[in-house]
Regions:
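C-terminal, loop-rich substrate-recognition/catalytic regions characterized by aromatic stacking residues
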Residues: 4-242
């Protein structure tokens, strides 16, 4: 089964909610970019470069400085396996910009846990087809010839893929999407020196939504070995088929 065949939509809604359905009435969520927002120096990037453990800061304090949307407590356990994606319809009052988003799990006891993240420079928002194939829902070439201008006040369709994960979110927990325009300790964003305002469309025919690769609990998983994923004879990579 293709990952797109099992993507579940959660729509960004007024009141900082993530809802399984969207309203026919359009609304807007406004956010002024805070360039001091950060995931801290011990982020996924430090893990890649220096093999350090990921240690995020107080996610609730960070969320207070961002645009956030959260589900109601989940009625059932939900397994997310694959790459989540975010489809935003937005405008900015600047001629450049970026978005940095995190997906978090809010436990029933109030604790918040980091699940994954994604980021995109608006100029690279053109969605392309990967020449060598891509298992995820969204792919950008990041090549010069695919750059798109950013016009202040003009609506943009900004789709980005978050890093793939496999996790089980328990019934009673919630999911929170946190949207920022910067990550001070990890990213150099194009808007440093200015404070643009982002306006994200909620509802209507251009509704912004989070797409989650949710696994059907009634289907037994199958997998195949990915040939040549790693050198040597002792390392294997597997691709889940459903």
């Amino acid at each position: 089964m293709c990952i797109r065949d099992r993507l579940k939509s959660w729509y960004l809604a007024p009141g900082a909610e993530l809802l399984p359905t969207t309203s026919s009435e359009a609304d807007v969520a406004e956010y002024r970019v805070d360039h001091d927002v950060t995931l801290g120096p011990l982020s996924r990037h430090s893990y890649y470069v220096d093999d350090l453990y990921i240690n995020t800061p107080d996610l609730d304090a960070r969320a207070d400085r961002c645009l956030t949307f959260a589900t109601a407590p989940l009625e059932h356990d939900v397994e997310i396996t694959g790459a989540p994606a975010l489809e935003l319809d937005l405008t900015t009052d600047a001629d450049r910009g970026a978005v940095m988003v995190t997906l978090e799990q809010l436990m029933a006891d109030g604790a918040a846990a980091y699940l994954t993240e994604g980021f995109l420079n608006f100029a690279h928002r053109r969605v392309s087809v990967a020449e060598l194939g891509h298992d995820g829902p969204v792919w950008h070439s990041h090549r010069r010839h695919d750059l798109l201008p950013v016009e202040p006040g003009e609506p943009m369709a900004v789709s980005l893929e978050l890093y793939p994960i496999s996790c089980l979110v328990r019934a009673g927990d919630r999911l929170r999407l946190t949207v920022a325009g910067a990550d001070a300790d990890n990213l150099i964003v194009p808007t440093i020196g200015i404070e643009p305002t982002l306006r994200v469309t909620l509802g209507g025919n251009r509704a912004s939504r989070l797409l989650l690769p949710v696994v059907n609990p009634n289907v037994s998983p199958t997998a195949s070995v990915v040939e040549g994923a790693f050198p040597g004879d002792d390392a294997y990579a597997f691709r889940r088929s459903n």
